[in-house]
């Protein structure tokens, strides 16, 4: 019988290198396609979630607008809570607002994550972005960011009946209650900022800079990426040591 040369198996290190390359490619695609960083390569595994542009809910945003789709974010938050390898959550926001119910739904889920969490407002955290900004255990904002506080808006057909006005009031009450319950600002003060008529042209509301947002108690601290990560690392370390 002819001699058959046994098929050579790839060296273990070569297989490992191939897996590392594939993992890096998948991570790069995830960052490029959706702006998600599953876990950092630092001292602890921090999941970075971005909320940018318009928060898209039951209706699609126009094609020329960047958006964050809530049906994409919800499974990620479930995975963050379920995956034991993920130790913390960092939510980075630069949003103009969007669908009220979708924004509140995401804010409720973020507030329900049992792992250390932090939010960082860059650029803007406007409208329904406010509940998202205060939904984590600790909130940070850069000095140059702004936050717009205003009443609930609605586009499309509106029925001119008392029930419609009551619906808007109830939605606004839920927003005020959530923000006041997850930050240092009172419901009364938040409502005053929301109904301010002396700042915006032909509109109602208040624009807060980074330092103003902290002074009002809406955001916990002025800070940037390093500050948010240091907070998360400290919380994770404290949890592991039991302090």
Model-derived regions: residue spans:
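N-terminal organellar transit peptides
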Residues: 1-130, 135-150, 154-243
